[in-house]
């Protein structure tokens, strides 16, 4: 059994990473989305333990001090972090894990473990602003702040293994699914399985 692959999807806020991730885990039972810890309040219909683990700042800091975070970041005065234990235990079972995090979190993870990273670029800043506005969860000032942060985030695209322009969401979903499928078939991920299969072929007689 191969070890699972850790996939990272990043994008500016409103860039589509969460929507794409939800599609992937709905299509493929052999991949699970990592649920991040956060100190922010739930938005809309978000549920604890499904969308995020909503914790207090004291609880978050305790987890951080105990080494439970594979990566962490602060965004708009809210803290976010990925569980190190969940990632390792899930990968050990041969199940792939998908993390939706920003470029800073991706940078931290790259320094600690192997991963495949995908960055989603918005087709334009105007379309990104429209997406942020349509969510109806942020004030005008927060949206302007997110757009400024987006300009910083997209400059880090070259650190990623794959970069896609998310102009057509349906097309982007299929492209990311294809990337995951291709990565699973690489020999480095399946060397032992292929080696055993080839050995069995060599033992056969014609």
Swiss-Prot record:
Q: Which named protein is this?
A: Guanylate kinase
The top EC class, named as a word, is: transferase
Free-text function comment from the UniProt entry: Essential for recycling GMP and indirectly, cGMP.
Query: EC annotation?
Result: 2.7.4.8
Which segments does the entry list as coiled coil? none
**What family is this protein classified in?**
Belongs to the guanylate kinase family.
**Which gene name belongs to this protein?**
gmk
Location, primary (coarse class): cytoplasm
The species is Neorickettsia sennetsu (strain ATCC VR-367 / Miyayama) (Ehrlichia sennetsu)
Q: What is the lineage of its organism?
A: Bacteria, Pseudomonadati, Pseudomonadota, Alphaproteobacteria, Rickettsiales
């Amino acid at each position: 059994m191969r070890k699972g692959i850790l996939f990272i999807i990043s994008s500016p806020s409103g860039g589509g990473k969460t929507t794409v991730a939800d599609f992937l885990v709905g299509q493929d039972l052999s991949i699970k989305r990592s649920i991040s810890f956060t100190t922010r309040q739930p938005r809309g219909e978000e549920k604890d333990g499904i969308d995020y683990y909503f914790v207090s700042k004291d609880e978050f800091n305790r987890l951080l001090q105990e080494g439970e975070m594979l990566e962490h970041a602060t965004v708009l005065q809210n803290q976010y972090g990925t569980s190190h234990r969940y990632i390792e235990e899930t990968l050990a079972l041969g199940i792939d894990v998908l993390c939706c995090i920003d470029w800073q979190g991706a940078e931290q993870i790259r320094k600690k473990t192997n991963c495949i990273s995908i960055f989603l670029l918005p087709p334009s800043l105007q379309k990104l602003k429209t997406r942020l506005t349509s969510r109806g969860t942020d004030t005008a000032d927060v949206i302007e702040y997110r757009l400024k942060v987006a300009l910083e985030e997209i400059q880090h695209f070259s650190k990623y293994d794959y970069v896609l322009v998310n102009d057509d969401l349906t097309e982007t979903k299929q492209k990311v699914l294809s990337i995951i499928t291709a990565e699973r078939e690489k020999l480095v991920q399946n060397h032992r399985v292929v080696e055993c299969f080839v050995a069995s072929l060599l033992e056969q007689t014609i």
